[in-house]
Amino acid sequence: MKKTFIFLTMLLIWIETSFAQTNPAITAWIQNHDGTTGRHYVANNPTPIDDGILANVQSVDYSDNWVYVSATGIPSYITGPFLDNNPSLATDQQAIYKISLNPTQNTGTATNTTGGNIGVFVNGVSLFDYRDGVRWDNNYNRLCGGPGNPSCSGGPQANRDWNRDAIPAEMGGFDCNKAHPAMGNYHHHQNPSAFDLDLLVVSDVCDTYPADGLYVIDVNEHSPLIGFTYDGFPIYGAYAYKNTDGTGGITRMKSSYSLRNITTRVNGPYVGQVFTIQNGPNAGNQQVMDLGYFREDYEYIDNSEPDYLDEHNGRFAVTPDYPEGVYAYYATVDENHNSAYPYVVGPTFYGNVTGADVNTINENTTNYNSNLSVNEHPENILDLKIYPNPNQDFVAIQSNLLDKKLQLQLVNELGQVVLESEILSGSTLNILETHTLYNGIYFLKVSYEKQQKSYKIIINK
């Protein structure tokens, strides 16, 4: 009897552990086990400043129905500066994200996305939808809401026909990671990869203030799982299997939204109208309200091709993390890898919205420690992009999204270690300064847990 009891107890523990290790909503989070802290730039100073705040996710706890993700909202990649006179910095949100482990499709009227948090990325950074809170007030023929604009007539909750899209309107205020803070809440509206990695670079902020974003687009690999929304469904990066059954090779996931063919907007400004900001730090600046300036400039066009997404910006398909298939959203980009509306989720959710940022955990939970997990890492974890090579003054080392640190050693031909560094968990980039080294052949030794790999690097000044 005693042996039977012990066996049953061990079986229950094994079942519980197996559940945690096979549910990506529990295992996908980038936990901070090494004390990594956030860093930020300020304008006119390209040297990062340490925040002194723990980065990434601090704790993951789960029950039968929920996972609770405790995070500061601070990434390990360098944030800032925000060059549109945004006075805010990324600050500790002390957040606890409650996400369903059993998400369900909403079979009734779809729920609109809202301003503020609608999900969370795997590093604990908030996800916002397209909007920035600025709208067109047709009663006064002006923009309303947001910094520097008058309040909207009827109050902040009044519906408006034309709601501004943050991506074109606030381009100058995004940092290299394509993100910015709202009253300290650092967040992404769009695909969270760095501007300078796009095929057509639309912002030069990375030239002075380099950072790496959450992940690197690889056109030959299925993009990683990068977050979860408040309806409990996962978010992937920009590329996936073409066909929903996992066949057809890798391709870019495409938005089914297109700009409408209009020159006027009913109860709104005409296309191309110029608006001058009247108040605030950007007073006197002008913005051209071209097509795409407002969310309502887009229309949904149904497409039966498997690599085109539905009206929520998702589809049901096989993914590396869900071999039986799952409904998932995708961070959509165009052919130049520039962000494409509706960016991640929206304008409505696919599922029933049950998630939230809560104050406390009010049920019994089990803690998940990724340091103790036995998850297998992808074989390409040490496949790096190294450029320029040959180099003169620096070499950039780009990795895929990491859940643990990547150790770097630069070794000369005598076997001497001349430089040591690392790529932090939740980060993808390291820049080694080589201007003090002699010309010659060097070897970059890369270590990830027990895996190792070497690359030849040439310095030629």
Description of each model-found segment:
Residues 1-22, 374:
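Bacterial Sec-dependent N-terminal signal peptides
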Residues 19-20, 376-461:
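C-terminal outer-membrane/trafficking sorting elements
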Residues 21-175:
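Solvent-exposed N-terminal domain segments of exported/luminal and surface proteins
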Residues 69-115, 119-122, 192-244, 342-348, ...:
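A short, polar beta-strand/turn micro-motif
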Residues 122-125, 182-195, 322-338:
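Extracellular/lumenal glycan-associated surfaces
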Residues 132, 148, 156-209, 230-231, ...:
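Core of folded catalytic or high-affinity ligand/protein-binding domains
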Residues 231-233, 238, 242-355:
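Extended, compositionally biased non-globular segments
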Residues 365-381:
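Low-complexity, Pro/Thr/Ser/Gly/Ala-rich linker/spacer regions in secreted
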